Amino acid sequence: MGTLGRAIHTVGNRIRGTAQAQARVGSLLQGSHHIEKHLSRHRTLITVAPNASVIGDVQINKGSFISYASVSRDLQYPRAMGMGQVRRFSEDVSHMPEMEDSDVLNAFKDLMAADWAELPSAVVKDAKTAISKNTDDKAGQEALKNVFRAAEAVEEFGGILTSIKMEIDDSIGMSGEGVKPLPNDITDALRTAYQRYAEYLDSFEPEEVYLKKKVEMELGTKMIHLKMRCSGLGSEWGKVTVLGTSGLSGSYVEQRA
């Protein structure tokens, strides 16, 4: 085995170690899901693994579950524009929730502007502080909770997508020199990952377009990287995008100001 081969093998071993540490989130790739509505008005997608199984080197224990993400189902945000205010293009499409508390608003802005592949600890701390503080801006806190839980789900699911890609790289080589048919477990993992991705995006309500676009931009790149490494995937993979649903006009980018 040459130097490059040993390096790839070492990377594969490290990734497998990481994958084993992610066993608690491995259930995203197996089983069915149902929608459970909580008193807090959050919608949580729960994925349950009916039988113990292994996806690559990720052990999925029987009955394991994960709170995949949650978004508000009944929060209605005002869309009316006041006299003399500037109306952005596609305002009705990507309207942001109104927030009165400055701490909640700043935490919301920082979270939407952060990289969800690995959430910065400072951003997480500020978000948790704003969510738990005593304030009259309950609607703002609910909106922040939705974004924070979505960010946590995207971070964990993105880690699984990365583990799948590394497993593929370890199997066929970084440059594809050992190209061969994918093992059935990886094929099943890819199929289930796309299903979870598509179902999650479809779950967003019209008033949550800003959050849907953020999720698409965070996970779309990882999904496309998987698509580029494999041939023969279904035509549905052509729908994966990193551009969001309606471009950037009125999107979270404006919240950085």
UniProtKB/Swiss-Prot annotation:
* Record keyword Mitochondrion present: yes
Upper classification of the organism: Eukaryota, Viridiplantae, Streptophyta, Embryophyta, Tracheophyta
Q: Which GO terms describe its cellular component?
A: mitochondrial inner membrane; mitochondrion; nucleus; respiratory chain complex II (succinate dehydrogenase)
Write one Pfam family the protein is assigned to. Answer: SDH5_plant
Q: What is this protein called?
A: Succinate dehydrogenase subunit 5, mitochondrial
Question: What is this entry's stated membrane topology?
Answer: Peripheral membrane protein
- Which segment is the transit peptide? 1-89
Record key words, sorted: Membrane, Mitochondrion, Mitochondrion inner membrane, Transit peptide, Tricarboxylic acid cycle
Q: What is its main location?
A: mitochondrion
As for subcellular location, the record says: Mitochondrion inner membrane
Which pathway does it take part in?
Carbohydrate metabolism; tricarboxylic acid cycle
Q: Which GO terms describe its biological process?
A: tricarboxylic acid cycle
The UniProt subunit note reads as follows: Component of complex II composed of eight subunits in plants: four classical SDH subunits SDH1, SDH2, SDH3 and SDH4 (a flavoprotein (FP), an iron-sulfur protein (IP), and a cytochrome b composed of a large and a small subunit.), as well as four subunits unknown in mitochondria from bacteria and heterotrophic eukaryotes.
Native species: Arabidopsis thaliana
**Which InterPro entries would you find in this protein's record?**
SDH5 (IPR025397)
